[in-house]
């Protein structure tokens, strides 16, 4: 009777990249909502939310050279419209009555209180910085570092490599 699964996209422990698209297809075939922890995936993988088809994907901005205290949550519109906010605050509520409350339109429905404007501007610059390098170049460089690290560590008999990140 599983309703929701939460999985990581890229493990910061083993380097394993989970097949999110395939996992999502299987989960959706059973009516299960898929939430992906993309904190490691965001800065290291080429992401296409339409292709992955997960219901939610969370990214931590500081993992992408952005400010701390800020994150991004991608959510499918059908879920964002359907689910209530987890907290309330100014700017997100349209109307309060004795017996009901109505929330603003997306994305305001989930923007409680004062937005962290400086952090959002800083994160925009982080994205531009990463885009100037190019995700393909980042992936290529990381692959070269992994191959070099594995080559050096395999020569050390005191080290046992676990996993095979790519």
Label every PLM stretch briefly.
Residues 1-166:
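Pyridoxal 5′-phosphate
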């Amino acid at each position: 009777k599983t309703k929701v699964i939460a999985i990581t996209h890229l493990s910061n422990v083993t380097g394993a990249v989970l097949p999110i698209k395939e996992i999502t297809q299987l989960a959706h075939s059973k009516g299960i909502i898929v939430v992906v922890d993309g904190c490691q995936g965001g800065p290291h993988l080429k992401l296409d939310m339409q292709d992955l088809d997960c219901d939610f994907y969370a990214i931590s901005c500081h993992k992408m050279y952005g400010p701390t205290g800020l994150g991004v949550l991608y959510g499918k519109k059908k879920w964002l419209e359907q689910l209530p906010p987890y907290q309330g605050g100014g700017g997100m509520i349209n109307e309060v009555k004795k017996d009901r409350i109505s929330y603003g339109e997306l994305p305001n429905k989930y923007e409680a209180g004062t937005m962290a404007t400086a952090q959002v501007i800083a994160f925009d610059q982080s994205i531009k910085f990463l885009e100037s390098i190019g995700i393909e170049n980042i992936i290529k460089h990381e692959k070269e570092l992994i191959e070099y690290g594995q080559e050096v560590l395999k020569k050390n008999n005191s080290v046992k490599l676990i996993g095979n990140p790519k």
